[in-house]
């Protein structure tokens, strides 16, 4: 997959960069693997905004993705690669030898007709799923479990990965794409390869409407608000806020660490993320 630059026939198209989806499935998703998803627009059950800048967006069907990969020893053939509106990565439709079908996160390089399998004896090829203790040091993996059998939670978005750095008894050391180095139980499963759609970071939507299709509402600057709405609000004429940048709740917003110091999982993190 790649990106496509559009002809600059308008001012907004001049900077627009979109994904080239010509190699993806153009039909409907597998009917047995979809469910309805209701957009809450960032509201909770009482109608109160709990997440700002969220809107309705385009209607979507949720694709049920298999993050556990617990069909051990059963080979599956990749029927097709599909676009998933609910995530940045592409997904692959698998057809198992016993007739069952499922969606998985598509790793980079996976293509129609490839055969994948889950199990300790599997080859180190993109799409195969193994226990971390069975994967060679230096291998790039994704969809990594934190608790055995609970399904992958690490490295699932487009272009992300975790590299197996070393093995130490019950644990292995993983370096995430953020730079964080973390201990994970060696009995957890992971899938070989880097997540597909590496060019997602280069996309430029080009117009406000595409953001609205994705369910993203406008972000208003604090200095444009009233004093009751934001610490930067108010003032006569155009003002700069008069203080160091903060969130609407007064928390410094330029690099302040927000992770709790006494979090129980701190003992598993050997090096914090380069991105803070």
UniProtKB/Swiss-Prot annotation:
Q: Which Pfam families match?
A: Ribosomal_L2, Ribosomal_L2_C
Recorded family membership: Belongs to the universal ribosomal protein uL2 family.
* Basic residues bias: start-end ranges: 254-270
Segments carrying the region annotation (Disordered) are 224-276
Q: Name one GO molecular function term.
A: structural constituent of ribosome
Q: Coding gene? A: rplB
- Superkingdom of the organism of origin: Bacteria
Q: Does the keyword Cell membrane apply?
A: no
> Which Gene Ontology cellular component terms are annotated?
large ribosomal subunit
Functional summary from the UniProt entry: One of the primary rRNA binding proteins. Required for association of the 30S and 50S subunits to form the 70S ribosome, for tRNA binding and peptide bond formation. It has been suggested to have peptidyltransferase activity; this is somewhat controversial. Makes several contacts with the 16S rRNA in the 70S ribosome.
Task: Read off the InterPro entries from this record.
Answer: NA-bd_OB-fold (IPR012340), Rib_uL2_dom2 (IPR014722), Ribosomal_uL2 (IPR002171), Ribosomal_uL2_bac/org-type (IPR005880), Ribosomal_uL2_C (IPR022669), Ribosomal_uL2_CS (IPR022671), Ribosomal_uL2_dom3 (IPR014726), Ribosomal_uL2_RNA-bd_dom (IPR022666)
Its BP terms in the Gene Ontology are: cytoplasmic translation
Q: Which SUPFAM superfamilies match?
A: Nucleic acid-binding proteins (SSF50249), Translation proteins SH3-like domain (SSF50104)
Per its UniProt record, what SMART domains does this chain match?
Ribosomal_L2, Ribosomal_L2_C
Q: What is this protein called?
A: Large ribosomal subunit protein uL2
PROSITE patterns per record: RIBOSOMAL_L2
Subunit text: Part of the 50S ribosomal subunit. Forms a bridge to the 30S subunit in the 70S ribosome.
Q: What are the protein's UniProt keywords? A: Ribonucleoprotein, Ribosomal protein, RNA-binding, rRNA-binding
């Amino acid at each position: 997959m790649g990106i496509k630059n559009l002809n600059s026939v308008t001012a907004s198209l001049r900077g627009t960069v979109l994904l080239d989806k010509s190699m993806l499935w153009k039909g409907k998703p597998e009917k047995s693997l979809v469910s309805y998803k209701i957009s809450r627009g960032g509201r909770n059950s009482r109608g109160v905004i709990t997440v700002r800048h969220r809107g309705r967006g385009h209607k979507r069907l949720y694709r049920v993705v298999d993050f556990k990969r617990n069909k051990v020893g059963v080979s599956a053939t990749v029927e097709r690669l599909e676009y998933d509106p609910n995530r940045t990565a592409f997904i692959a439709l698998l057809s198992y030898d016993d007739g069952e079908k499922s969606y998985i996160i598509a790793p980079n390089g996976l293509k129609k007709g490839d055969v994948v399998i889950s199990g300790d004896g599997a080859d180190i090829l993109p799409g195969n799923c193994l226990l971390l203790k069975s994967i060679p040091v230096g291998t790039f993996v994704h969809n990594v479990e934190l608790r055995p059998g609970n399904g992958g939670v690490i490295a699932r978005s487009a272009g992300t990965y975790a590299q197996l750095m070393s093995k130490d008894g019950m644990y292995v050391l993983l370096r995430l794409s953020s730079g964080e180095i973390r201990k994970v139980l060696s009995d957890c499963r992971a899938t070989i390869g880097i997540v597909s759609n590496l060019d997602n970071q280069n996309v430029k939507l080009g117009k406000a409407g595409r953001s609205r299709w994705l369910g993203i509402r406008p972000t208003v600057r604090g200095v444009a608000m009233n004093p009751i709405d934001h610490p930067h609000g108010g003032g006569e004429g155009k003002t700069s806020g008069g203080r160091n940048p903060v969130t609407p709740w007064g928390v410094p917003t330029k690099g302040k660490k927000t992770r709790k110091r006494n979090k129980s999982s701190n003992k598993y993190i050997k090096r914090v993320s380069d991105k803070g």
